[in-house]
Amino acid sequence: MCSIGEDDFGDDGATHAMVVESLPLGIVLSPGNCSKCDVNSGELYKLNFRTAECRECFLAYARHKFRAALGAAKILPRNAEVLLVLDGSAESLVLLDMLHFAQTQNTFKRLHCNARVVYVEEQKVQGRDPVHLEALQNLSTQYAPFDFYVIELGALPSSMQRIKDYSPSLNANNELIHKLQKLRSLTARQDYLQQQRKNLICSVAQCLQCTHVFESNISVDLATQLLTAIALGRGGSAALDVALLDDRLSGDVKLLRPLKDLNEQEIQFYIHAQRLKPLFEKGSCFGREHGQTASLQNLTSAFVANLQQNYASTVSTVFRTGDKIAANSNPEQSSCVHCRSTLDSEISDTLLAIEYSRTVSEAGVSLYKSGQDLEGLAKKRLENKDGLCHACRAIQAELDSGNLL
């Protein structure tokens, strides 16, 4: 089986739990001989727990992780139609560059798939100015012959345009923005926005007749995603939230995360080696400007970032734990109409306790009712066939008015 360098994730025990040095903010130029090819280089790349190597050897190592993730599981059929999601982050540019490199190799080494790129414009939803169109056009030219498309988050899939025809929409009447404003907590807004983004990407893939979608999540992102899913009550689907393959999307569209085995340091080094220019800084996601304690997602992200800085192997342990969780793949169980997660088939004591607490809170001055009546009402709510999972039902409960869908 193809190895992807698992020793670099600090899974070898207590020795890797020791803090050798903080992750570098950039590349330190240190000329010398490459430990791999023994060629003298003016710039060596020293990853944690690896010997220093030249630019060519580092790029070969990083690209091998990308190819090994897809090749080991054999989940990408030959000549598959692939949609790469570009969000302007460093990770998405690395994924774009790696896929383009794999597409331009000779026949023997070439990754045989037909790729398209879609840039999801999220700046209007976040209250920021849209990305410079010139930067997107430069990417389109640099990574020809990929077809580049642009769609705004919250817009209809039919509004998608090619990059050469795109101009930012001047219509301020965005239904998604209005719905986000109706949600009381930032936690619910971020969760709802994430699900809407995933559903939009699925619809775009169907419009372009793509069977597979590439997302640029790396190991630290997936560790954060795993803990966040559990905190939000999405534990039943947490395995698919961090897996290489997520098959919950409608229309038989499969979501792949081929960068799942890369870490932040490798992304930084790759960006420098290829002289890539991210469109946005890391951490510019929706709601991050409100601080670490403003939502469960922000708090979890800050917690994992602190672990990554001081105890990098712990993040690897969290991420690897997610790999070992078995996904619930019972085809007979219904799925949530919003997030496509498997619905709970039985009423658990935990869900009943949560719903009972919500019922008591909403009863207010009507607490003269007997405990039996309140418990019965809580059970009735759980048995309500609204097609929503527990986490999506919590978002629905926060809406001041209207329906989640």
Swiss-Prot record:
Main location: cytoplasm
GO molecular function: nucleotidyltransferase activity; sulfurtransferase activity; tRNA binding
Involved pathway(s): tRNA modification; 5-methoxycarbonylmethyl-2-thiouridine-tRNA biosynthesis
UniProt subcellular location: Cytoplasm
Protein role: Plays a central role in 2-thiolation of mcm(5)S(2)U at tRNA wobble positions of tRNA(Lys), tRNA(Glu) and tRNA(Gln). May act by forming a heterodimer with NCS6/CTU1 that ligates sulfur from thiocarboxylated URM1 onto the uridine of tRNAs at wobble position.
UniProt record similarity statement: Belongs to the CTU2/NCS2 family.
Protein name: Cytoplasmic tRNA 2-thiolation protein 2
Gene source species: Drosophila sechellia (Fruit fly)
